[in-house]
Amino acid sequence: MTEEVQQLSTGDKYFIEQRSLILQEINESMDAILNQLNGLNITLENSIAVGKEFENVSQIWKLFYNGLESEEQNMETVGVADSEHITEDVNPEGK
């Protein structure tokens, strides 16, 4: 290998040095990107964990709102039935 380096021209030596520097910079950049992606992954996992903690609370609120909707529908149904009975009582002959 040393014989090959001695036989290289000045331009080739410069190219090899620059290539080594660029490869080193690329390696450092890739390491930094990997570290930042690991940090992002940890943050996302923590966010998902917090969201899962609220899952039970959201189910309780969902049951509450569904119960309110069904209660409103029952009230409307009872209200319509009561108004029909009142109409029948006021007008028993159906006129």
Curated annotation (Swiss-Prot):
| Membrane-spanning parts | none
Task: Report the subcellular localization.
Answer: Nucleus; Cytoplasm, Cytoskeleton, Spindle; Chromosome, Centromere, Kinetochore
Sorted alphabetically, the Gene Ontology cellular component annotations on this record are: cytoplasm; DASH complex; mitotic spindle; mitotic spindle pole body; spindle microtubule
Q: Does the keyword Cell cycle apply?
A: yes
Q: Which keywords fit this entry according to its UniProt record? A: Cell cycle, Cell division, Centromere, Chromosome, Chromosome partition, Cytoplasm, Cytoskeleton, Kinetochore, Microtubule, Mitosis, Nucleus
- A molecular-function term among this protein's GO annotations: microtubule plus-end binding
This protein's assembly is summarised as:
Component of the DASH complex consisting of ASK1, DAD1, DAD2, DAD3, DAD4, DAM1, DUO1, HSK3, SPC19 and SPC34, with a stoichiometry of one copy of each subunit per complex. Multiple DASH complexes oligomerize to form a ring that encircles spindle microtubules and organizes the rod-like NDC80 complexes of the outer kinetochore. DASH complex oligomerization strengthens microtubule attachments. On cytoplasmic microtubules, DASH complexes appear to form patches instead of rings.
Question: This protein is called what?
Answer: DASH complex subunit DAD1
Q: Which organism is it from?
A: Kluyveromyces lactis (strain ATCC 8585 / CBS 2359 / DSM 70799 / NBRC 1267 / NRRL Y-1140 / WM37) (Yeast)
